[in-house]
Amino acid sequence: MGLCNTNLTLSAAQATPEAVEYTEILEAEDRPWVTVVWDDPVNLMHYVTYIFQKLFGYSKAKATELMLQVHNEGKAVVSSGSRDKMEHDVRRLHAAGLWATMQRDD
């Protein structure tokens, strides 16, 4: 009986790290993707505001807020969602001449 109890204890101890790793993977998969627009020396602030309104449907106030964040902080998150949608958003921003990347949300 002592051997059975020892084996059960070892099995339980070995299962714990796998459960933690699996949980970490699930949490990483649950994090949405985001599109980040970066400051650049080319585009005018008015144009960036216009693009945010046109591509994402933001109000002038929200688009201006995001544009100022890009201008003052160097970047701003302009959209979030699935990886496919963020890839699409990045392509549209590139087509408009803006610098944009995508990443997992923090």
UniProtKB/Swiss-Prot annotation:
It holds the Pfam family ClpS. GO terms for biological process: protein catabolic process; proteolysis. Binds to the N-terminal domain of the chaperone ClpA. Involved in the modulation of the specificity of the ClpAP-mediated ATP-dependent protein degradation. Belongs to the ClpS family. This is ATP-dependent Clp protease adapter protein ClpS. It comes from Nocardia farcinica (strain IFM 10152).
